[in-house]
Amino acid sequence: MAGVRLVFTKAFMVTVLLTLLLNIGVKPAEGQFSACSFSSRPHPRGICGSDLADLRAFICSRRNQPAMVKRDAETGWLLPETMVKRNAQTDLDDPLRNIKLSSESALTYLTKRQRTTNLVCECCYNVCTVDVFYEYCY
């Protein structure tokens, strides 16, 4: 038996590697992103269903609210010293005011994260943080 030599073809090796990848799965490094598939199940500490929608709405509504400002106790109106006044002269002196771009050119400056996952994948099938919810606020 010392003289037995195993010979594997490329097709056999590719089949073995694909089988291993499909059965074991490729997991991302911790903290990079969450991977989900059709066989994913909710994490024991994940937030799912209407709880997920409610929490997203709450976090996004709190994020978009302005900072606390002083209000008149009797009327509830903002006090004048907390209001921001625009200065017409500084608005005219703005160096970016005369820059004109086509819509197509202007859109190239906007960056948006390419999503490979969604909120359910990140927060129901995995455990997520508040920062993940912020990424889904519009």
Swiss-Prot record:
<dbReference type="InterPro" id="IPR016179">
    <property type="entry name" value="Insulin-like"/>
</dbReference>
<keyword id="KW-0968">Cytoplasmic vesicle</keyword>
<dbReference type="InterPro" id="IPR022353">
    <property type="entry name" value="Insulin_CS"/>
</dbReference>
<feature type="signal peptide">
    <location>
        <begin position="1"/>
        <end position="31"/>
    </location>
</feature>
<keyword id="KW-0732">Signal</keyword>
<feature type="propeptide" description="C-alpha peptide like">
    <location>
        <begin position="87"/>
        <end position="111"/>
    </location>
</feature>
<feature type="modified residue" description="Pyrrolidone carboxylic acid">
    <location>
        <position position="114"/>
    </location>
</feature>
<protein>
    <recommendedName>
        <fullName>Molluscan insulin-related peptide 5</fullName>
    </recommendedName>
</protein>
<dbReference type="InterPro" id="IPR036438">
    <property type="entry name" value="Insulin-like_sf"/>
</dbReference>
<feature type="propeptide" description="C-beta peptide like">
    <location>
        <begin position="72"/>
        <end position="84"/>
    </location>
</feature>
<feature type="modified residue" description="Pyrrolidone carboxylic acid">
    <location>
        <position position="32"/>
    </location>
</feature>
<feature type="disulfide bond">
    <location>
        <begin position="123"/>
        <end position="128"/>
    </location>
</feature>
<keyword id="KW-0873">Pyrrolidone carboxylic acid</keyword>
<feature type="disulfide bond" description="Interchain (between B and A chains)">
    <location>
        <begin position="60"/>
        <end position="137"/>
    </location>
</feature>
<comment type="subunit">
    <text>Heterodimer of a B chain and an A chain linked by two disulfide bonds.</text>
</comment>
<dbReference type="GO" id="GO:0005179">
    <property type="term" value="F:hormone activity"/>
</dbReference>
<keyword id="KW-0165">Cleavage on pair of basic residues</keyword>
<dbReference type="InterPro" id="IPR016724">
    <property type="entry name" value="Insulin-rel_pep"/>
</dbReference>
<keyword id="KW-1015">Disulfide bond</keyword>
<feature type="disulfide bond" description="Interchain (between B and A chains)">
    <location>
        <begin position="48"/>
        <end position="124"/>
    </location>
</feature>
<dbReference type="GO" id="GO:0005576">
    <property type="term" value="C:extracellular region"/>
</dbReference>
<comment type="similarity">
    <text>Belongs to the insulin family.</text>
</comment>
<dbReference type="GO" id="GO:0030133">
    <property type="term" value="C:transport vesicle"/>
</dbReference>
<dbReference type="Pfam" id="PF00049">
    <property type="entry name" value="Insulin"/>
</dbReference>
